[in-house]
Amino acid sequence: MAVKGAAKGRGPPRRKQPRFETSRVQDLDDREPLNGEQVVSEDALNEASDAEYSVSSSDNEEEEKSTDKPYNVLLQLLNASEDSIGPAKKKRKLKHKEKNVKQQTEATKEASPGKGDLDLQDDLDVKEAENTESDNEQVENDEAEGSEDEADSGSDPFEIHFSQPDEAQLSKRIEATSQKWRTSRQTLPAGMRFTAVYPDVGEEQNLHRASLHSPKDLTLKRKLSEAASVHLPQFDAPNTSVAPYLFGYYDMIYGGRTTGNAAKLRDMYCLHALNHIIKTRDRVIKNNARVPKEGEDIEIRDQGFTRPKVLIILPTRQACVRVVDSISKFYQAEQQENRKRFMETFSTADDDTWEDKTEDFRELFGGNDDDMFRLGLKFTRKTVKFFSQFYSSDIILASPLGLRTAIEKEDGKKIEYDFLSSIELVIVDHADALLMQNWDHVEYIFSHLNLQPKEAHGCDFGRVRTWYLDGNAKYLRQTLILTSFITPEINSLFSHHAYNVFGKIKIDSTYPGAILDVPVPVPVRQTFSRFDSLSPVKDPDARFKYFTSTVLSSLAKNWSSSGKSSAAGTLIFIPSYLDFVRIRNYFATSSQTTNLSFGAISEYSSPRDVARARSHFMNGRHTVMLYTERLHHFRRYKIRGVKRVVMYGVPENPVFYKEIAGFLGIDPAAVGEAAEKGVRALFSKWDALKLERIAGTKRMGSMMLEKGGDTFTFT
């Protein structure tokens, strides 16, 4: 499993740490990457540019060679023959062309076994100008076939939101975004909470919508409706409450994603994305047919600056495979170009040794867990093309790191972001997993959405929608964030980068509390200590002061020269790596911890150092173990020898709390003593969201506001 570390730009920059000359400290300062981590070369990170300004969706393609390619020669011959053949033979030409492409594909594979797919990809990934010609040909073919779908309904959210918005109302809402937004709250079934935020235009709005129970309640294209009736006949609860906002083009952050409902949510947003791009394409095709009939003076506004309309941000390549599989269920194309190569480079089998890992871990890291990728998908009426150039793609799927390296080089020079100028639907799936990579990449991508393009890229500005030309595209873009839990970082992204003037929806859960489900056979003493903190900026210093003056002193005071200590078997769980470094340095240099032996392991520790530290801790040679949240996220170790848990801060993921507290029950012989010493966790008022998931929604309020004391104990 490739662990996401600084070598790929996920964490803090790799620096040489000062080595502590003491036998009590492990050699952890080298900060080597975890086992299996691959260092991405500069060439692999910066291959995004193609020719003049085309952006490639492949992260290992070579420069395209337009000369001496048999396939290009074939294309020239076909184009020459097409010039001499009339429109009546259009379909026959296309069939002939497909036949020759198939023959060329087979010939390429035979000529170059093992590299056939890569060589073919070089031929198929044509440049932007060539794609334009191909797209025009496909549009003509679509026109000849005619539209198979019914007329657009006036109640269709796509028509109301994008195609025919009320210009006066739209201007009024955009103007109101600079002022205070109104908020309304309601309670939903299954313990969910609903919050709606919308621009204050002088009148109160009720954004609560009735639940949708099946695709029959949606305005889908006929082709998608038929597939949805087979693969997604019903929306499961609580997805019925999510559906009206997802398909209604509201911005939404959904904090109830689980391993149980993730697949259904994925099917829903893939169906929505496909419906959007097909309606966009069909509208262009219909208007193309109007121009010859009604004259060139007719004003048609049906396009953006560039073709890509949907951006899906995902944590791993295997997550990308799952999304593509979902798309393929609903869009059953006759031909899928480069699908074989996609599966070979994006999908791998699960690790059979992970049977004891938790379900959420297997979902995230199962298969290919590489977080450096990007992929363009191009849709025509009968074909889906993988690894299409971004400017020819309809949907872009990427990891935050993969997409950022397509925008910006390592030296900070921006090379390309025009392909993001016309994104109308952006989906962030498994956002809580992205927090453990590098959240700065996500914010960087959002800051480059819907900007005015630097170049024309063949755009027909006479057909660009007015709200694109006015620089208002971000106010109509739909942003969907799906996460297992909501954090301040996710809230900040939604507040500062989701601008939908039709409304923003937040749906999150109420929590019974992870303290009720600790996997230890006897009751565990769980103590929460609150400390005062004036601001988030000052919180790290206040936490450190409280820890060293109160918690650590109680651990060290019973230490005796005989070598026995009540602090033995103490695991200190530290959420932040910066805090980890600070605590490690204090343990190594402070007189308060002179007689405390300790080990320290983090996401940057080598496998050898991790194994040695765990062994010393289990055998009692180390009294204290420092352990980071990010290391636990990537490895899910089961640490033996734990008799007491001290949490420097409560974890974001409530599953982590249960797993860390569960270390107390690993040794059956010592479980009674360990349960009595139990867990002690520090928190401040800035930890409200985390504390709610750990202690429970009802308990959190009193723990934050209680004036009679700052210590709360549960068993």
UniProtKB/Swiss-Prot annotation:
InterPro entries: P-loop_NTPase (IPR027417), UTP25 (IPR010678), UTP25_C (IPR053939), UTP25_NTPase-like (IPR053940). One of its GO terms (biological process) is maturation of SSU-rRNA from tricistronic rRNA transcript (SSU-rRNA, 5.8S rRNA, LSU-rRNA). Residues 88-99 have a biased composition (Basic residues). Residues 18-34 have a biased composition (Basic and acidic residues). Keywords: Nucleus, Ribonucleoprotein, Ribosome biogenesis, rRNA processing. Residues 131-153 have a biased composition (Acidic residues). It comes from the Eukaryota. It is found in: Nucleus, Nucleolus. GO terms for molecular function: rRNA binding; U3 snoRNA binding. GO terms for cellular component: nucleolus; small-subunit processome. Residues 1-166 are annotated as: Disordered. Pfam families: Utp25_C, UTP25_NTPase-like. Belongs to the UTP25 family. DEAD-box RNA helicase-like protein required for pre-18S rRNA processing, specifically at sites A0, A1, and A2. Component of the ribosomal small subunit (SSU) processome composed of at least 40 protein subunits and snoRNA U3. This is U3 small nucleolar RNA-associated protein 25. It comes from Uncinocarpus reesii (strain UAMH 1704).
